[in-house]
Amino acid sequence: VLCFLVYTALLWASNAALYFSKMSLNPDSVVSYYLGDPATFRQPRSMLGLLEVLHFHSFAMGILLLTLTHLMLFVPLSLRIKAWGIALSFGAGLANEAAGWGVRFVHPGFAWAKVFSFLLLETTILCLMLLVARALLFNRPSDYNGDT
């Protein structure tokens, strides 16, 4: 499991690096990325380009979040915290994918959702990794039932 967490940490860091290589936390940069910018000769993102990203991200992020949240179920936390962790991580992942489509094809205001969902997704993945690592490294007992 620790080896998986190391790979997940690499994915987490590279996800942030890829995001910040194209955009910033400024919604204007998100709009420029998705809608294009004539001043910098940037073309708008095509539907096919977005679809290809969605195709791979929906599978990869789904499996990643399924695995991380499954591991979190064994961490001694209340059922309420576990449920929130699962809902927030999957919600952030879906919102992060949908927000780009929203910016491109609905309204530039979805750029705020893209920034927020990216930050929430990165935060939830980091929290899941840290919770699982803490439980493993400090020999915390398994608590699948969430009785704590």
Which residue stretches match the model-derived regions?
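Alpha-helical transmembrane segments of multi-pass integral membrane proteins
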Residues: 98-148
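Individual transmembrane alpha-helix segments
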Residues: 44-63, 72
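Membrane-interface interhelical connector segments
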Residues: 24-44
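N-terminal signal-anchor transmembrane alpha helix
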Residues: 1-25
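Cytoplasmic juxtamembrane regions at transmembrane-helix boundaries
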Residues: 67-89
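Hydrophobic alpha-helical membrane segments
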Residues: 84-101
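Membrane-interface helix-boundary signature
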Residues: 1, 44-47, 78-85, 107-117
